[in-house]
A protein has these predicted regions:
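Phosphate-group recognition and catalysis centered on beta-loop-alpha active-site segments
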Residues: 1-363
């Protein structure tokens, strides 16, 4: 057996159980430039488009259930109350609420007056009244399509840095992955889920509990986006709180080697932070590399030339077009016209691809 010297994880058995026989076309939050993000409508859209993976995010509620949301605080740009009014910013913390309380809100229509976020993602959305789904509802939706090859790449959103405003209400990573694991096993999805996180402690806990579940190590070094967007912190004296106790300096600042040390199956960096050398090194360690979040054709082609195994995009229809032009094998779409979340695969092409400072992926 081969062990990680840092974590005593048997990395010879922590291989990706997910079997990707096609390019991993990932619809970010279900495809937030075309359907309301992290809703059953966007997830159904991704399936019917022919995405390999539904990329999505999850939070743990006060009553111990997992719901699908990127932000731990309800996003005022997309959330309306029972009276149809957009909520106040920073008012509702999902981690301090029950599922019943959350189901009173609607997240299907973006506020057209919210500014840049609407310009980037809202203008091209088809909108629907939509509630925040639970992880179980996502699993049930996937099962309703009958396609046993659909993958869910699901992110835990933790803030392990004590200086972060969101730190104090973090769930316990061990408890979170236990609940996640129970749901995945309940729906027999072990070979069709990936757990991804910037908080590598979550990934460590997942591998300890169930090494059959694939994990993906996210990272970013974008100080202009804010302190929480610096996960590696290569040049600081203290170890980064994002890496689960690992010191990146022990790996010469190399996140590929560091991710391999915790038994990660996939590495997922921000797309401007990788090179052909990173791709080749990941492959030499039997790891896949799937950058995020890529929304224009030029960058997609650049990454494909490097040899990446997948791409996460807000514009999955555009990524599909790019891949088809290159004759890259894709997943076959599955259509379910009887699904209440079936909306077809129409899209609009009117929004810019990135914010002025390039940080649309960080919203």
């Amino acid at each position: 057996m081969i062990y990680s010297r840092f974590y005593n994880i048997d990395i010879s058995t922590t291989y990706a159980k997910v079997n990707y026989d096609v390019f991993d076309l990932e619809a970010h939050r279900g495809g937030r430039d075309v359907r309301p993000e992290n809703t059953l409508y966007s997830y159904a859209y991704a399936i019917e488009l022919g995405a390999t993976s539904i990329e999505c995010d999850m939070q743990l509620t006060k009553d111990g259930q997992i719901v699908m949301s990127h932000n731990p605080i309800l996003n005022s740009d997309i959330t309306r109350d029972e009276n149809g009014n957009y909520i106040e910013n920073n008012k509702y913390d999902i981690r301090l609420m029950t599922v019943d309380e959350l189901k009173k809100f609607d997240v299907g229509v973006m506020d057209p007056n919210c500014g840049e976020y609407y310009d980037l993602h809202g203008k091209t959305q088809f909108t629907y009244d939509a509630k925040i789904p639970t992880l179980e509802e996502l699993m049930q939706l996937i099962q309703s399509y009958g396609d046993k090859n659909i993958v869910s790449n699901i992110e835990t959103i933790f803030y392990p840095d004590p200086t972060s405003a969101e730190y104090r209400n973090n769930a316990d990573p061990k408890k979170f992955v236990e609940i996640f694991n129970n749901i995945v096993k309940k729906y027999d999805m072990e070979d069709r889920v990936v757990l991804q996180s910037f908080d590598w402690q979550t990934l460590i806990e997942m591998k300890k509990l169930n090494p059959n579940i694939s994990t993906s190590a996210l990272w970013q070094e974008q100080p202009s986006w804010g302190r929480d967007s610096e996960s590696l912190r290569r040049y600081e004296k203290k170890k980064s709180p994002w890496l689960g106790g690992l010191d990146i300096k022990d790996y010469q600042g190399n996140p590929v080697k560091a991710a391999h040390a915790i038994g990660a199956d996939i590495i997922s960096p921000y797309y401007t932070e990788i090179s052909k050398q990173d791709v080749d090194e990941a492959h030499s360690l039997d790891m896949k590399i799937v950058p995020w979040t890529v929304n224009n054709e030029k960058d997609m082609n650049m990454l494909l030339d490097m040899g990446v195994d997948g791409i996460i995009s807000d514009k999955p229809w555009l990524l599909k077009q790019v891949l088809e032009k290159r004759n890259i094998k894709l997943h076959t779409p599955t259509i379910n016209v009887d699904s209440p979340y079936h909306t077809g695969t129409d899209h609009k092409d009117t929004a810019p691809t990135e914010a002025g400072n390039g940080n649309d992926a960080a919203y």
